[in-house]
Curated annotation (Swiss-Prot):
Matching Pfam families: Oxysterol_BP, PH
PANTHER family xrefs: OXYSTEROL-BINDING PROTEIN-RELATED, OXYSTEROL-BINDING PROTEIN-RELATED PROTEIN 8
Sequence similarity: Belongs to the OSBP family.
Modified residues (Phosphoserine): S14, S65, S68, S314, S328, S342, S807, S808, S810, S814
Region of interest: Disordered: 1-129, 322-399, 771-823
Protein name according to UniProt: Oxysterol-binding protein-related protein 8
Biased composition (Basic residues): 781-794
Keywords from the named record: Acetylation, Endoplasmic reticulum, Lipid transport, Lipid-binding, Membrane, Nucleus, Phosphoprotein, Transmembrane, Transmembrane helix, Transport
Annotated organism of origin: Homo sapiens
PROSITE patterns membership: OSBP (PS01013), PH_DOMAIN (PS50003)
Function: Lipid transporter involved in lipid countertransport between the endoplasmic reticulum and the plasma membrane: specifically exchanges phosphatidylserine with phosphatidylinositol 4-phosphate (PI4P), delivering phosphatidylserine to the plasma membrane in exchange for PI4P, which is degraded by the SAC1/SACM1L phosphatase in the endoplasmic reticulum. Binds phosphatidylserine and PI4P in a mutually exclusive manner. Binds oxysterol, 25-hydroxycholesterol and cholesterol.
Top-level taxon: Eukaryota
Length: 889
C-alpha cells in the first residue's frame, strides 16, 4: 500500500494513520496489484472507497478531554504508528481475488454483485443511479437529523441592496441552513457548500467579515428547503452567487471560517470514509454535546497559537461525526476545489464523475427528460402608426355644423365644475383606441431606460430618465381626440424588442375600477434592469368654454440593480374653444420626478398658451434638475420639439431632447398580441366594431356599438350587486394599506445572466425562463410601509402563475393572491389601534375642559365684566349690520 502511494501524499498517509483511534484493527481490502493503480494524482472514486478502512460497530473513539488538548485523537504515538504498519502489512497480503471494483450500492459484501468486464453498460448505469439515490438519501438525512450540527449562531448577512439582516445560521456537513428565527421554523435558504470558496473580507464595521462565494459566479442556493419548502420566508433579497457574512467578533468569525472549511471537506469525505458494508453505527452522542464539543475545539484553535495547538481536519471530522450514520452531500457534486489536496490526489476523477456535473441540479431523474417548448404569447409587429405633426397644427380642429349641434346638446346636460366621467361623449371626438393603449405611448423609447440602468453617475441617470419621460409626448393623434373609456376588466398587452440588448420590454394594463375609472399598468424588462408600475385615475372637469382631463396618480420607475425608485406624476390635458374660438388641445400642470434614495429630482412645468400669445408659445415647457434644494440645470423649450438644457455652473446650453426624423425612425417597434390569441376583454377585440365604424366615418353605427358595450357593463354591475358579489381583477390587486394597485406577478429581482435565460409573457403573466430553479424571496419596496410583503413561488419560471407547466418537467403550482400578504398587519389590529387613539383623545379633551372650567371659575370679577361688555358691543355691531342690509335691500 505504501509503495503504491506517491511521495506527495502526506495528508492521505496521515489520514490512514489517524484512523486507528476510530476504526480499530480493521482490514484494508487492497493488494499489490491494486496499489499499481494509485497514481500520484489519479484514482477512481470506487477504488478510493475500497482503499478506506471500514469502521466496526463495537469500537468507538474516546471523547476528547478539554483539559488535555494533546490527548488521544490529536497526537499519534509510536504504538499507533507500529500498529498502523501491521495493518498495512495485513492488507498487502490479501489475494488478488478479494479486490474488486466497488459497485456503489450499500448491499452486504457477501451479496453485492461485483462488476466485471463482461457486465453490460446497462448494469453499470443501474449501479450508478443507485449510488446517486443513496447519496441523495444521505444528504437529506444529514439535513433533517437534528443531532448533526457543526455550528449554529446568529450572523449578519448583507443583502442585494447592501443592507444587513440578522439571521440564524445552522452549519451542517456540506450545507449552510439559514433561518429567520432560532426555532428553525422560518427557513430562508440553503447554501450548498461543495462548490463554494471562503475568503476573509475587510470591513469598516465592527466584528469579523468574510465572504462565501462560487468562483464561477454560479448559484450557491439549493432548490428546496430541509422539509421540502419551495419558497423561503420573506426577507431582503440575497445574492445568488455569494454571501457576505459578519460575525460579532474576530474569534467567532475565524471559528466560523474554520467550521465552513471543514464542512466543505465533509461534503466529500463523509461519503468516502463512512461507507458501511451492510451495517450502520448507532448514534452515541447527542446533538447538544456534539455541538458544544466541536465549537470548543474550533474556539480553542483560534485562541491558541499555531505552534502550541494545531488541529488536523480529519481528526476534528472523526471527533464530531464518530458513531453517526452516513452523511454526505450528493455524489454528483464532489468536484469541489475546496477539498483537500490529499482527497483530490487519492480519489481523482473517473469517467463517470466527469459527466455528473450536468445532472447536479436534480438527481431524482433517472433519465434526462426532453425540455418542453416555451409556451408564450404570439406577438405581431404593429403595421400602422400615427405620428402627429409638431406644433399647434395637429392639436386644433374645426367642428362641423352637425357636430356643433351635438356639442350644444351635450352642454345642456353639464354645468361648470361638473365631473364628466359619467357623461356619454359623442363618438366623433373619439380616438379609435382604448385609454389603456394610449398609456403605452411612453415606451417607444424604452431603450433610454436601458441606458439609464447602466449609468453609474446618479445625475446623468436622472437626465436620461427625464429624457425618456419627454419622449412619450410627441406621438399624438391629428385633431382633438379622446381615447375610449376602458370597460371594467379590459386588458391590453404589447411589447417592444430592443435590438441592441436583445431584450423585450413588456407592457400590461388592466381597467381595475369603473367608478371611479382607474387604469393600472406594469412595464418590465428584467434583462435591461428596470420595471415600472402605476395606476391612473382619469377625471374630467368642465369650465364653460374649456374642459380638462386630469390624470391623478403616479408611476414608479425602479432600477433593479440599484434599488432606486423614481416617482413621477402626469400633466393634465386642457381643451379650450368649445363654445367659441378654435378647439385646441394642450398639456398643462407641474410634473415631479423624484428619487428619494439619491436625493435627485426634476420639476417640469407644462405651460398653456397665453390668451394673447403667438404660435411660438404653444407646447412650452420649463424645468429644473435639482439635488436636494440645489438647482443643477434648467430646461427650456417645447415638449413636442426641441428642449434645451443649461448647466447652472458653466452656463453652457445644449440640446437636451429633439424628436428629429432620425430619432423617430430609430424608435422601438411595438408588437401587439396576435388577434386570434386575444381574449374577449382585450382592448383591440373588445372595441373592434366601434373602431371599424369610426374608421368608416359611420358615427351612428359607432354610437350604437359603443352603447352595446356600455350597457353590457352596466348589466354586469347590476348582476353582481344582486348576487352580492365583488369584482375581482385578473392581473392586479389593491394594497389596502397604501391604496395602490400592484401587478400580481411582479418580479423585481436583478437579472442573473448565468441563470436567467429569457423573459416572456403568457396570458398576461410576465415570467422568466431560468436554467436552474432557486428559491426566490421578495422584499417590500421602500415606498411601502413595512407591512406589505409579497411571497413568490419559484418553479420552472421565476414568476408564479396558475396552470403553467414547468419547462423542466415539474408541476406548476397555483398561487392565490390572498396568500401574498400573510405578514401584513391585519385590519382589525389597525382598527383597534385607532380606537385606542380615539379614547386617548377623549381623555385629553376631558382634561382640557376641566382645566378650562377651573380657570373660568377663578377669573376675577373685573375680567368677567369686561367679557360681558365685549359681548354687548358685538351684539350691537351685528344689529347695525342687519339694519343696514335691510335698508339697502
Amino acid at each position: 500500500m505504501e509503495g503504491g502511494l506517491a511521495d506527495g501524499e502526506p495528508d492521505r498517509t496521515s489520514l490512514l494513520g489517524d484512523s486507528k483511534d476510530v476504526l480499530g484493527p480493521s482490514t484494508v481490502v487492497a493488494n499489490s496489484d491494486e496499489s499499481q493503480l494509485l497514481t500520484p494524482g489519479k484514482m477512481s472514486q470506487r477504488q478510493g472507497k475500497e482503499a478506506y478502512p471500514t469502521p466496526t460497530k463495537d469500537l468507538h473513539q474516546p471523547s476528547l478531554s478539554p483539559a488535555s488538548p494533546h490527548s488521544q485523537g490529536f497526537e499519534r504515538g509510536k504504538e499507533d504508528i507500529s500498529q498502523n504498519k501491521d495493518e498495512s502489512s495485513l492488507s498487502m497480503s490479501k489475494s488478488k481475488s478479494e479486490s474488486k471494483l466497488y459497485n456503489g450500492s450499500e448491499k452486504d459484501s457477501s451479496t453485492s454483485s461485483k462488476l466485471t468486464k463482461k457486465e453490460s453498460l446497462k448494469v453499470q448505469k443501474k449501479n450508478y443511479r443507485e449510488e446517486k439515490k443513496r447519496a441523495t438519501k444521505e444528504l437529506l438525512s444529514t439535513i433533517t437529523d437534528p443531532s448533526v450540527i457543526v455550528m449554529a449562531d446568529w450572523l449578519k448577512i448583507r443583502g442585494t441592496l447592501k443592507s444587513w439582516t440578522k439571521l440564524w445560521c445552522v452549519l451542517k456537513p456540506g450545507v449552510l441552513l439559514i433561518y429567520k428565527t432560532q426555532k428553525n421554523g422560518q427557513w430562508v435558504g440553503t447554501v450548498l457548500l461543495n462548490a463554494c470558496e471562503i475568503i476573509e473580507r475587510p470591513s469598516k464595521k465592527d466584528g469579523f467579515c468574510f465572504k462565501l462565494f462560487h468562483p464561477l459566479e454560479q448559484s450557491i442556493w439549493a432548490v428546496k428547503g430541509p422539509k421540502g419548502e419551495a419558497v423561503g420566508s420573506i426577507t431582503q433579497p440575497l445574492p445568488s452567487s455569494y454571501l457576505i457574512i459578519r460575525a460579532t467578533s474576530e474569534s467567532d468569525g475565524r471559528c466560523w471560517m474554520d467550521a465552513l472549511e471543514l464542512a466543505l471537506k465533509c461534503s466529500s469525505l463523509l461519503k468516502r470514509t463512512m461507507i458501511r458494508e451492510g451495517k450502520e453505527h448507532d448514534l452515541s452522542v447527542s446533538s447538544d454535546s456534539t455541538h458544544v464539543t466541536f465549537y470548543g475545539l474550533l474556539r480553542a484553535n483560534n485562541l491558541h497559537s499555531g505552534d502550541n495547538f494545531q488541529l488536523n481536519d480529519s481528526e476534528i471530522e472523526r471527533q464530531h461525526f464518530k458513531d453517526q450514520d452516513m452523511y454526505s452531500d450528493k455524489s454528483d457534486k464532489e468536484n469541489d476545489q475546496e477539498h483537500d489536496e490529499s482527497d483530490n490526489e487519492v480519489m481523482g476523477k473517473s469517467e463517470e464523475s466527469d459527466t455528473d456535473t450536468s445532472e447536479r441540479q436534480d438527481d431524482s431523474y433517472i433519465e434526462p427528460e426532453p425540455v418542453e417548448p416555451l409556451k408564450e404569447t404570439t406577438y405581431t409587429e404593429q403595421s400602422h402608426e400615427e405620428l402627429g405633426e409638431a406644433g399647434e397644427a395637429s392639436q386644433t380642429e374645426t367642428v362641423s355644423e352637425e357636430n356643433k349641434s351635438l356639442i350644444w346638446t351635450l352642454l345642456k346636460q353639464v354645468r361648470p365644475g361638473m365631473d364628466l366621467s359619467k357623461v356619454v361623449l359623442p363618438t366623433f371626438i373619439l380616438e379609435p383606441r382604448s385609454f389603456l393603449d394610449k398609456l403605452s405611448d411612453y415606451y417607444y423609447h424604452a431603450d433610454f431606460l436601458s441606458e439609464a440602468a447602466l449609468e453609474e453617475n446618479p445625475y446623468f441617470r436622472l437626465k436620461k430618465v427625464v429624457k425618456w419621460y419627454l419622449s412619450g409626448f410627441y406621438k399624438k393623434p391629428k385633431g382633438l381626440k379622446k381615447p375610449y373609456n376602458p370597460i371594467l376588466g379590459e386588458t391590453f398587452r404589447c411589447l417592444w424588442i430592443h435590438p441592441r440588448t436583445n431584450s423585450k420590454t413588456f407592457y400590461i394594463a388592466e381597467q381595475v375600477s369603473h367608478h371611479p375609472p382607474i387604469s393600472a399598468f406594469y412595464v418590465s424588462n428584467r434583462k435591461d434592469g428596470f420595471c415600472l408600475s402605476g395606476s391612473i385615475l382619469a377625471k374630467s372637469k368642465f369650465y364653460g368654454n374649456s374642459l380638462s382631463a386630469i390624470l391623478e396618480g403616479e408611476a414608479r420607475l425602479t432600477f433593479l440593480n440599484r434599488g432606486e425608485d423614481y416617482v413621477m406624476t402626469m400633466p393634465y390635458a386642457h381643451c379650450k374653444g368649445i363654445l367659441y374660438g378654435t378647439m385646441t388641445l394642450e398639456l398643462g400642470g407641474t410634473v415631479n420626478i423624484t428619487c428619494q434614495k439619491t436625493g435627485y429630482s426634476a420639476i417640469l412645468e407644462f405651460k398653456l398658451k397665453p390668451f394673447l400669445g403667438s404660435s411660438d408659445c404653444v407646447n412650452q415647457i420649463s424645468g429644473k434638475l435639482k439635488l436636494g434644494k440645489e438647482v443643477l440645470a434648467t430646461l427650456e423649450g417645447h415638449w413636442d420639439s426641441e428642449v434645451f438644457i443649461t448647466d447652472k455652473k458653466t452656463d453652457n446650453s445644449e440640446v437636451f431632447w429633439n424628436p428629429t426624423p432620425d430619432i423617430k425612425q430609430w424608435r422601438l417597434i411595438r408588437h401587439t398580441v396576435k388577434f386570434e390569441e386575444q381574449g374577449d376583454f382585450e382592448s383591440e377585440k373588445l372595441w373592434q366594431r366601434v373602431t371599424r365604424a369610426i374608421n368608416a366615418k359611420d358615427q351612428t353605427e359607432a354610437t350604437q356599438e359603443k352603447y352595446v358595450l356600455e350597457e353590457a357593463q352596466r348589466q354586469a354591475a347590476r348582476d353582481r350587486k344582486t348576487k352580492n358579489e365583488e369584482w375581482s381583477c385578473k392581473l392586479f390587486e389593491l394594497d389596502p394599506l397604501t391604496g395602490e394597485w400592484h401587478y400580481k406577478f411582479a418580479d423585481t429581482r436583478p437579472w442573473d445572466p448565468l441563470n436567467d435565460m429569457i423573459q416572456f409573457e403568457k396570458d398576461g403573466v410576465i415570467q422568466t425562463k431560468v436554467k436552474h430553479r432557486t428559491p426566490m424571496v421578495s422584499v417590500p419596496k421602500m415606498k411601502h410601509k413595512p407591512t406589505r410583503q409579497q411571497k413568490k413561488v419559484a418553479k420552472g419560471y421565476s414568476s408564479p402563475e396558475p396552470d403553467i407547466q414547468d419547462s423542466s418537467g415539474s408541476e406548476a403550482q397555483s398561487v392565490k393572491p390572498s396568500t401574498r400578504r400573510k405578514k401584513g398587519i391585519e385590519l382589525g389590529d389597525i382598527q383597534s389601534s385607532i380606537e385606542s387613539i380615539k379614547q386617548t383623545q377623549e381623555e385629553i379633551k376631558r382634561n382640557i375642559m376641566a382645566l378650562r372650567n377651573h380657570l373660568v371659575s377663578s377669573t376675577p370679577a373685573t375680567d368677567y365684566f369686561l367679557q360681558q361688555k365685549d359681548y354687548f358691543i358685538i351684539f350691537l355691531l351685528i344689529l347695525l349690520q342687519v339694519i343696514i342690509n335691510f335698508m339697502f335691500k
